[in-house]
Amino acid sequence: LIVSTLLLSFTNSLAQEERPRARDIGLEIGIFETGALNAITDVTGVRVGHETVIEGDDIRSGATAIIPAPGNLYTNPIPAWIHIGNGYGKMIGETQVREFGEIETPIILTCTLCVWSAASALKDWMYQQPGMGEHTLNPIVGETNDSRVNNMWADPIGHDEVFAALNNASSGPVAEGSVGAGTGTQAFGWKGGIGTSSRVLPEELGGYTVGVLVQTNFGGVLNMNGAPVGRELANYSFRDYVIPKGSDSDREDGSIMIVVATDAPLTARNLDRVGMRAIMGLARTG
């Protein structure tokens, strides 16, 4: 299980099948107002792009790119931190971020066994950017395991897919659900994928924006605003042990990547604190 939160601070098209978001059906989470898009792209400068790969009977995966700031991130790195909630994963680039407290590339999310090819592609993309010389580079790539529906051993995500996600990145609405790195993932025993939201603090508290993007792939007992939805629908982790009805479920397994961005002027030390609170927010979902 990997639960990683990547925090950033600095001063596309819709999914194939458009579905209502939580607030569209009257489910309002929290007390603060959302940004205009209710997405991580409400934080000025943040762009998100997806590339979805569906091939044959066994490839269901993709890449999601988060570009956290305009310009060349290598020559103009921004404060960042990676907070690990549970460290069973194959993330690339963590140690340097935790040493220097800054990020120098975009972030790529993909499937577990694609992280190395994705990191190589991100490296190649960075060296094509204006102002890059011959330097070492610390690509940031996170992952979740989508092997229930995806043959990740075929290494379906590489140069072309990562380049497409990066080059398609925009500051507009963010496609959610079975798209990009969320194509083959699940949550709480149902289909999961990519999700995003944002909140804006009142002017008296600085007026800052906080945006989140997640790649879900985990189990639990789904709660929506405190309502025990998973329990009521009898679809939750460890159900087969509590109410024996066979062993056809693996809802207790999984992972999640959480990317948090803000325009609040926070240091890497305080971004770590934000990451801890993001894990608390995850716990509230069940």
Please provide the spans of the model-predicted regions.
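Alpha/propeptide regions of enzymes that mature by internal proteolysis
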Residues: 16-286
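Bacterial N-terminal signal peptides
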Residues: 1-9
